[in-house]
């Protein structure tokens, strides 16, 4: 996690270099995010790096990791060749995954579900989901797109066309044209 209280770019670089020196094969990087419902939202830590510094940390991580033969395969994940997380890729490819344990989430048969966060409740009814939602075809399509955008390779339009029986470029022509017109 980067963007910690009082963390400077040089501190983050040193931490990253130390991690690399351990001969790791995979690393996930996440910027510190303080949720509005947590203790720190009401009592914020002092000296958090600003957004620009956090962006610099992220960009520096990409530079350092790629220089050390890590592939940036997903927005927050880097791996040496053949060490990409199969679990992560399964998730970002919007495939089935099962949630086992307290507060675990899963996705099966077009249904998202999560288990109770209460340990006693989960132990007494481990197969009963706390909540579930059957996704509509449109919701499934939207999830396929936004999850795919997390991967550096992006989305596979041909796969989406087959899976959802659509013409992606036709269906989203107006949105695509809008963003093309921005000329980033």
Locations of the language-model features?
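C-terminal scaffold of the Radical SAM
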Residues: 1-166
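Alpha-helix C-terminal capping/helix-coil junction sites
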Residues: 66, 180-183
């Amino acid at each position: 996690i980067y963007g910690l209280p009082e963390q400077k770019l040089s501190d983050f670089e040193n931490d990253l270099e130390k991690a690399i020196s351990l001969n790791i094969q995979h690393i996930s990087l996440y910027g510190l995010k303080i949720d509005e419902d947590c203790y720190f939202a009401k009592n914020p830590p002092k000296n958090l790096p600003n957004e620009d510094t956090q962006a610099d940390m992220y960009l520096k991580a990409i530079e350092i990791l790629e220089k050390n033969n890590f592939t940036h395969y997903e927005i927050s994940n880097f791996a040496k060749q053949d060490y990409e997380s199969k679990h992560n890729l399964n998730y970002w490819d919007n495939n089935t995954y099962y949630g086992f344990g307290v507060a675990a989430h899963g996705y099966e048969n077009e249904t998202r579900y999560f288990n109770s966060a209460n340990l006693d409740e989960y132990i007494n009814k481990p197969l009963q989901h706390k909540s579930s939602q059957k996704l509509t075809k449109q919701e499934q399509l939207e999830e396929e797109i936004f999850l795919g955008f997390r991967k550096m390779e992006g989305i596979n339009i041909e796969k989406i066309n087959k899976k959802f029986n659509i013409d992606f470029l036709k269906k989203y022509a107006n949105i695509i044209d809008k963003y093309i017109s921005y000329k980033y």
